[in-house]
Amino acid sequence: MGYWISEFVRVLFGYVFMMYLWPSVIFRKKLSGKSLTFRFAFCSTVSILLVNTAVLGLGLVHMLKGWLIACIFYGILIISVLKNKELRASFFLLFRALFAGTLGGKTLIFRMIYNIKKCIIRTIRCLDKKTKGRKLEYSVLSVLIIFAVAYFSYGAFQCHSYGWGDMYVHHAWIYGLKEGKIFSEGVYPEAMHCFVYCMNVLFGIPVYSCLLFMGEIHVSALIVAVYCLFREVMKSKYTVYLILAAFLTVDVVCVDEIYGISRLQYTIPQEFGLYTQFLCALYLICFIRRNPKSDGEKKKGIDKNLFLFTTSLAASIVIHFYVTIMAFFLCASFALLGITRIFRKENFRPLVVAVIAGGVISTTPMILAFATGTPLQGSLNWGMNIINGTDTKEGRTQVAQNISEENSEEENSEEENSIKKSTDISSEIQENQITTSENKDMTQQIENNAAVQKHFSVKGMVQKIIDNIKLVYKYGYAQLYGEERAGWIIRFTLLSLALGVLNLIVYFIRLKKFPFEMYLGITFASVLFMILYAAPFLGLPEIIAGARLCLTEQILLFAMMAVPFDGLFFLFEKTKAARFSPFLSLLGVASIYAGTHYFGIFHGYLYYELTRYNSVVEVTNSIIENCPKYQYTIISTTEELYQAIESGRHEEILDFYNRSKQEKYIIPTEYLFFYVEKKPIQYAQYHFFTGPRWLAQAKYTKFYKYSNAVLSEGDEIANSQISEFLLNEPITITGKASDAYSNIKNREILESEMYFWCQKFKMHFPNEIKVYYEDEDFICYVVKQNTDHLYDLSD
């Protein structure tokens, strides 16, 4: 565990340096006098854009080298620091004394440490001044951030493998950057890959450790971005603490939501970029709200809100297109009631320019790469899937179509019965009435006209809207939250809507103009994202996979439900007791935490897609540390390739199985490590964690009882057993090795073949093969061979 804690600290340091410290030093003049919110938004977006542009720019001219990246980033940092006259004079004075022989090396180090200490003290004092009068607020926010990071990183300390299959793909793309190849698998937003690559180059942190921990650490950026947005749009600046506390403690009751929230544990592009959508909305709102006549920055041709909107938009594009789409809908929800302000001359033109600038900044490297012959990455075909109405891997379009067809068949059946019944009645009437043909023709014409009028009537349109609302409720609210919770959400939605309308009326009566109302914006956003989730069931294209919307929708729903409490906070702040508002927010956060425990709705532990035992990870680490670089080969399933790729070689167990049946088969490294699962693991099982009840509870497995997923929890792992009876059994052929291992029968056969091959090798060379590690689930054999006389590994 000590190793993983140290790796977590290294990743944390590298992340803070790259995301915040480096841009804070480089742009200290730009940031001087700015608020903490501005500093956060600036650093967290500009750093991403600079890293992405630098790495991809060098890659486009085939100059992407680790040493060059280090020279650029450290060089810019040193030059920026030395621009300070005091620091420059101190630096040159120290080194002049060192080279003159009047200053020893130890003294130089102590003096440099002293100067660094002075800088830290100065920074702390500056921070103290910035947070004056708000220390309790920031303390509560810090506790919430620490709790969030602890909750989402808990799994990485329990299971040291990647938690999601996509992470192996992203690792491969990052390794492509290490080899100097950008867009190694096709044109795709690479900002996250570039960021991890720079952490690896600048600090020597293994890519494996970066991907294992950075996503959980980056949750802090999401929490702060949500904090900044709702602190701005709510009438009370303390309501946002209730929103964050509810998001971090209240449980969920649907597998889509569990999946959506679990994704925050993984270092993958969409979740890495989620914070940018909230920053886009924040600075669009701030830009629309501003008063240009009193804005001093207008004279300079600069608007800080528009600048940060541009950088946030650009950052969302370079990280993941889904995030940009979500940012669009989030911004549209808030901007709807400020539409007249947007189309003002002083707003519309700058906004259009900002959007174009954001698009150009972010897409230029991708466009240039595509223009020079690099194809698009396969996952970008989602656009064509939307146009064609076909499913993505996570899509529900086909499911929705099947349900729609079933409903149509039921309706048609009912309609046929109704027609048959009406026909029987008409027959009886015709038997008892004698009518002329003229009357029949007239009656038919009247009926046709009535049918046409009914079809195009307002009543029909209203009925269509009502039907769609019912579908959104059924396949959105009720599906995600169950009937009881969905009922409460609808009540809060109506209440928030009423409060928003009331605010509009009061403001209009007082000032004779319509305000840019935020309560309605929050409510519209929560409803719009629910419509996006239920889109395929409404006959609309599924622009974003529903499960990926759940996390943002969860935050928006809590924000909407906090609107009535925001009104109460606002009224409380107008009284003489307003000075107790920070303590009231602290009490609210504590009450939510205690209440979720008391009412049994405290959130549960999340899951990883388990692909290997922890002992396998630890053994691989041991091999990496103790064996010479590239002088060993690990023969195992695919996962070890990514952990050891920077220092060793890897042979797929499936390839070993096939090649060992050839006439001759050698592996040209000094050390061979054979990994054998004595109990073959059920590949990609949903492994739920267990742990202390103050952090979370074990409660989510019950929601998977009707799914096909293989589940495990805590110390229990779903696995099988190797056997001699499985030798020479046929293996199911698959497209690639990793797919073969997901079939438990294949895995049993391959692990059995490997185990008994090692036993056979031991019979022939008893002193050459040794057990490197063994427990009840896993065994690792090692063979040391003479590279001049390699062993023939064929049967």
Tell me the role of every PLM-derived stretch:
Residues I5-W22, S220, E271-F278, I446-I509, ...:
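Alpha-helical transmembrane segments at the extracellular/periplasmic loop-to-helix junctions
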Residues L60-G66, F157-M167, E179-I182, F203-G204, ...:
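Membrane-helix boundary/interfacial segments in multi-pass membrane proteins
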Residues D128-K135, K237-T239, S294-D303, I342-V352, ...:
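Membrane-interface helix-loop-helix junctions at transmembrane boundaries of multi-pass membrane enzymes
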Residues K130-T276, G296, T552, E609:
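Active-site lumenal/periplasmic loops and adjacent helix-entry segments of GT-C-fold
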Residues I174-Y175, S585-I667:
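Extracytoplasmic
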